Amino acid sequence: MDTAIFIDWMSFAARWLHVVTGIAWIGSSFYFIALDLGLRKSPDLPEGVHGEEWQVHGGGFYHVRKYLVAPPELPEHLIWFKWEAYSAWLSGFVLLAIVYYVGADLFLVDPEVLDISTSLAIVISVGSIAFGWIAYDLICKSKFGDDNTRLMVFLYILLVAMAWGYTQVFSGRAALLHLGAFTATIMSANVFFAIIPNQKIVIADLKAGRTPHAKHGAIGKQRSVHNNYLTLPVLFLMLSNHYPLAFATEYNWIIASLVFLMGVVIRHYFNSVHAGQKHPVWPWPAAIGLFIVIMWLSTVPKFFEEENAQSQHLAPYEERFVVAANFDAVRDVVAGRCSMCHASEPVWAGIVTAPKGVKFETDKQIAQFASQIYLQAGRSHAMPPANVSFMEEGERELIVKWYQAALDRTSP
């Protein structure tokens, strides 16, 4: 099995695992937020019980009670909700490494944005993600973090700043994905470093016969609320790499900033409903209005048009594909079968921007995406979709020979 196929399957496996664990984490998070907001007081509740809720699901009835601090005695069987968050982050980081670190030349670095080495780009990636958690956590623990509204405003400003910063360093696709990873790291670290440790302190106090302090529950609640409001934007950012209209624009950082506001207003609506309040009307017009602005921004032309043509300087890994046997013939195949969609101005009906932001207008671009051309059009029939441009088997075989010839040139 060649390396490109192996890496693609590892990417698929990591993505599958990440989606499964993400569903588990988000599902439990949404459930407990709804449960917490839906708790009701009752005169016959035991001392220390904050509220209760009756639920029905799958033909069975459930009676749930919440202790504001902790029960008088610790039950023998206690279920922890933490592994979903840990496994979601770990699988996400593995996926980030496979796609954007192993494939840094292809997906992470864009010389037209910032011409840096792949090694430096990876260092910036890891460092910025770690920085996000450290900065956020320090602010939460400071006096500044005692005011929840003020803290949320700070968090939003931090996210907007990172959105802009990432778009100045990475490709548009990588920038939005990294903003999602940056935010998701804050969320999962909240579980690992704040929520679970404070719960363990409460349990230790119970075992020692001490009365747990309410502040430990308050810390966990604050971080849990933050996670609740950040979930929907993270999902958007993780999906954005499939939609060039979101990332292939100079206004991508503004789009990301507006998405965070959309997530807040949508979650506010559902939180209000779960709390038994009157259904607020304003969140949906606000969310729709924000989304209309996002759609408009995706089509706005650049404010400053670039005068210089895109650099055609070839990186070493690109040059090997350009000088490999059959490149001229492959270029003709790509031009005839792929360029009607993969272009700055696609001519195929219904295509307004190059799929996934991938363009095949220059030798450099073809060489840059050689592995994707090989996998999608050479080794499989994924591209062109439904073979709408009638790519022939001989042309697919030509792509395979060209790709393998390029690899053979660098083999020891």
Language model features: what each stretch is:
Residues 101-216:
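Long, contiguous internal "core" modules enriched in hydrophobic/ aromatic residues
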Residues 145-153, 248-252, 274-288:
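Membrane-interfacial entry segments at the cytosolic side of transmembrane helices
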Residues 73, 80, 93, 100, ...:
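Aromatic- and Gly/Pro-enriched helix-to-coil junctions and flexible linker segments
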Residues 80, 85-104, 163-177, 230-249:
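Alpha-helical transmembrane segments and their membrane-interface junctions
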Residues 3-7, 63-81, 213-217:
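Cytosolic juxtamembrane amphipathic/interface segments immediately preceding
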Residues 131-137, 191-194, 261-271, 294-300:
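Alpha-helical transmembrane segments
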Residues 29-72:
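Membrane-interface amphipathic/juxtamembrane segments adjacent to transmembrane helices
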Residues 15-45, 182-198:
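Hydrophobic alpha-helical membrane-embedded segments
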